[in-house]
């Protein structure tokens, strides 16, 4: 394989270090341990190429993916000739190379939303200017950029006049305009198309892109070349698909915006126009594993845009181990190398049931011997499948155990994570009166609340103030002490009106809490100041562009709305406000590159909570790196550090840690030791509590790329799919004929891992390894 695709000196160094012995994919790949190291590999290869091509043409990505590429490139350039820099260079094939000069390179912008003002911080134009032109010291004069403000339109107008609602109707390319505005819009679309052709020509006039670095989307998109893009596509104005819009929602302030925003993107043929080009796709985390496998193991196909790199002898995928886990090479290595453990038996048998579409009891010894993985099981026999069945039954039995006399502390990175992960298990725990329960959300979660939601809520708050429906503000002591009292009453009032289906009173309950939050944040002393503050916040939000970072006080207000939502969910089960803890860890800032958790700022508050609650069981999200929002992963790091610190002063030998997952990433059956049956009633409780309580999330402004709707629907589908996998092994009759009603009524399953502290900290040590290479 590699004889056709010669590796550079840098690539040889990383390939040797990776320990990968076999590459059988259609495009070569290099694998590293973690996300920061992926940045190091990419930075080293980039600087190696620049040293050989000081006047070359480069195209680099935007978003979160290049965070460590940017940091490592800057680190190496700043430390090229000192001890720190030399050590890295000599280790990774840059030892003999002189420090590259970057100011003669030509930079090509990959893509941009359209229309979007170039002055907005969430435009890619702003990003590439900040991190690449200024950050790397590239030539602004040579750069080929996409500035939406400068693209000529009909009659010399600005896009805000031509497309006043920022929506571009591409059907005007083919149909007759219906009015004068549509005539101008049609002419403008033709002018944009002309501009895109000229942009493509400018790239080709300089010989095409020599070094392309890009990420890959959940649907496999490269730049904004989504699934189905023509292999010979060029720079164009185009629509995107739902998966791409869901990913872009975070940049643009919600799916309501991203679904209506077009993009200008270079094409797949633009990327491979120069046959000598180095074309690299980077992918981190297990959530990308499926699309990475399809992109690397499928022949050239418009369904998988990244397959276009097969045209380049210098085409590569750079992956973290997580992103490569589903590759046939990785699966072969998993089964063929190292000690055979029970997990391999379980996984291979369950996968064989899926592969053959057969129930477990119908799998014959001949089937096991014919499969390339199950045939490796030691002491393979007629009883092998039965042993796996018994193992899964034991996990289900554990999920049916009734826990008593426990102090439960359920934690989540964001509001709704706990509910979406293990609500059916929690309801079992809460129905036992000897158990005490606490809930804690570790970040403020403000980025999930849209400006529109806050504006609408504040408008309604003004309405109830004007109508005398917020009586609490009339009490003499409200602005001195009253605002801190009766928070449980807000919650009870809200839920009572969920029951009575009184939408007005429900909204009024939310506004009561918003008034309390405003008094706390803005230190309001009277009713007039309250009105002024509401008007001021509405004004700030109305004058913000979608996706703009909010001022700190508005961030806090959004966070406190989410905190109220969380209190509402657990109040369904009689949990009081004082048992719902809001930690607001400081690393969560809403910036594009968030900080790492800090021992004092982020770990200490968790330790203090542990001491205060003194739990016997702690639940947490056990998501691998890069499997979804990196907040999950960072909260896990901080929690692991807190457990370790707490263990220095208390005997934690009896403490149990529950590791769960939800909508961003899911467990496979072999990865867990507890399986909890989920009834239709459990699903209804989760769906109803989500719809009634997570008010800011019901419209799914920041959806999963897997579903255009509420996260609760995604969670329910995962539970149902998990049952399907286990039913294939155990048989449907196992469930509907079971002696326990809980199992007979199950139409979904929740998976989680129950660990002691030692097992959890061993997992945490693996996590620590995955941040080696952090700068």
What are these regions (language model features)?
Residues 1-58, 74-89, 96, 366, ...:
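N-terminal glycine-/serine-/threonine-rich phosphate-binding loop
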Residues 224-254, 298-311, 641:
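Gly/Ser/Thr-rich active-site loops/lids in small-molecule metabolic enzymes
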Residues 69-97, 418-440:
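Histidine-anchored nucleotide/phosphate-binding helix
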Residues 5-26, 87-210:
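Ligand-binding beta-strand-loop-alpha-helix segment within the catalytic cores
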Residues 666-727:
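A conserved mid-domain beta-alpha-beta active-site/ligand-binding segment of alpha/beta enzyme cores
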Residues 2-8, 21, 33, 266-367:
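ATP/nucleoside-binding phosphotransfer catalytic cores, i.e., glycine-rich phosphate-binding loops
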Residues 57-61, 210-216, 252-296, 317-319, ...:
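Glycine-rich anion-binding loop/nest that anchors nucleotide
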Residues 169-186, 344-653, 659, 691-692, ...:
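Active-site beta-strand->loop->alpha-helix modules in alpha/beta enzyme cores, enriched
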């Amino acid at each position: 394989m590699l004889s056709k695709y010669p590796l550079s000196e840098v690539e040889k160094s990383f390939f040797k270090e990776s320990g990968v012995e076999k590459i059988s994919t259609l495009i070569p790949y290099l694998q590293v341990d973690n996300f920061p190291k992926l940045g190091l590999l990419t930075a080293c290869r980039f600087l190696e190429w620049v040293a050989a091509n000081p006047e070359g043409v480069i195209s680099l990505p935007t978003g979160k993916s290049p965070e460590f590429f940017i940091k490592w490139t800057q680190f190496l350039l700043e430390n090229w000739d000192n001890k720190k820099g030399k050590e890295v260079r000599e280790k990774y094939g840059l030892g003999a190379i002189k420090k590259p000069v970057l100011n003669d390179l030509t930079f090509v912008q990959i893509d941009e939303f359209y229309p979007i003002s170039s002055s907005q911080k969430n435009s890619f134009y702003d990003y590439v200017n900040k991190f690449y032109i200024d950050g790397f010291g590239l030539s602004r004069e040579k750069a080929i950029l996409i500035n939406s403000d400068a693209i000529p339109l009909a009659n010399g107008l600005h896009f805000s006049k031509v497309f006043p609602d920022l929506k571009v109707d591409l059907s005007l390319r083919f149909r007759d305009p219906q009015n004068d505005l549509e005539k101008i819009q049609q002419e403008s679309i033709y002018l944009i198309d002309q501009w895109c052709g000229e942009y493509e020509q400018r790239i080709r006039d300089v010989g095409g892109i020599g070094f392309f670095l890009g990420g890959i989307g959940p649907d496999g998109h490269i730049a904004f070349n989504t699934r189905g893009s023509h292999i010979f596509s060029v720079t164009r104005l185009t629509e995107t698909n739902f998966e791409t819009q869901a990913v872009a929602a975070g940049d643009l302030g919600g799916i309501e915006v991203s679904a209506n925003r077009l993009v200008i993107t270079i094409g797949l043929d633009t990327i491979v126009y120069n046959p000598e080009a180095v074309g690299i796709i980077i992918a981190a985390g297990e959530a990308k594993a499926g699309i990475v496998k399809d992109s690397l193991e499928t022949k050239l196909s418009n369904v998988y845009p990244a397959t276009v790199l097969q045209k380049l002898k210098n085409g590569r995928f750079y992956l973290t181990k997580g992103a490569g886990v589903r590759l046939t090479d990785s699966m072969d290595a998993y089964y063929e190398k190292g000690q055979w453990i029970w997990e391999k038996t379980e996984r291979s048998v369950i996968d064989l049931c899926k592969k053959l579409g057969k129930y477990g009891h119908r799998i014959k010894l001949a089937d096991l011997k014919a499969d390339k993985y199950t045939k490796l099981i030691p002491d393979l026999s007629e009883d092998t499948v039965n042993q796996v069945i018994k193992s899964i039954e034991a996990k289900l039995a554990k999920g049916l155990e009734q826990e008593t006399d426990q102090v439960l502390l359920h934690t989540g990175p964001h509001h709704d994570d706990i509910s979406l992960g293990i609500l059916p298990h929690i309801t079992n725990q809460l129905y036992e009166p000897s158990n005490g329960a606490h809930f804690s959300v570790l970040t403020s979660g403000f980025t999930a609340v849209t400006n529109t939601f806050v504006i609408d809520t504040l408008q309604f708050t003004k309405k109830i103030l004007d109508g005398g429906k917020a009586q609490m503000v009339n009490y003499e002591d409200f602005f001195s002490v009253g605002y801190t009292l009766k928070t449980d009453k807000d919650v009870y009032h809200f839920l009572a009106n969920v029951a009575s289906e009184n939408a007005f009173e429900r909204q009024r309950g939310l506004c009561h809490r918003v008034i309390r939050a405003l008094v706390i944040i803005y230190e309001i002393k009277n009713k007039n100041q309250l009105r002024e503050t509401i008007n001021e916040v509405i004004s700030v939000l109305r004058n913000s562009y979608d996706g703009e970072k909010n001022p700190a006080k508005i961030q806090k207000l959004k966070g406190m709305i989410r905190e109220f939502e969380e209190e509402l969910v657990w109040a369904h089960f009689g949990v009081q406000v004082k048992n719902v803890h809001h930690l607001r860890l400081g690393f969560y800032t809403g910036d594009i590159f968030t900080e790492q958790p800090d021992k004092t700022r982020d770990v200490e508050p968790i330790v203090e909570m542990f001491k205060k609650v003194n739990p016997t069981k702690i639940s947490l999200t056990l998501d691998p790196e890069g499997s979804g929002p990196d907040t999950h992963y960072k909260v896990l790091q901080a929690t692991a550090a807190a457990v370790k610190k707490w263990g220095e002063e208390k005997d934690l030998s009896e403490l149990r840690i529950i590791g769960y997952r939800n909508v961003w990433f899911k467990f496979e059956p072999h990865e867990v030791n507890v399986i909890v049956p989920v009834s239709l009633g459990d699903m209804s409780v989760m769906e109803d509590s989500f719809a009634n309580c997570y008010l800011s999330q019901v419209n799914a402004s920041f959806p999963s790329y897997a579903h255009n709707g509420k996260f609760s629907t995604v969670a329910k589908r995962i539970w149902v799919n998990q049952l399907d996998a286990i039913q294939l092994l155990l048989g449907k009759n196992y469930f509907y004929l079971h002696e326990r009603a809980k199992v007979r009524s199950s139409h979904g399953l929740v998976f989680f891992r129950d660990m002691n502290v030692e097992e959890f900290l061993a997992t945490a040590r693996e996590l620590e390894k995955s941040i080696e290479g952090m700068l």
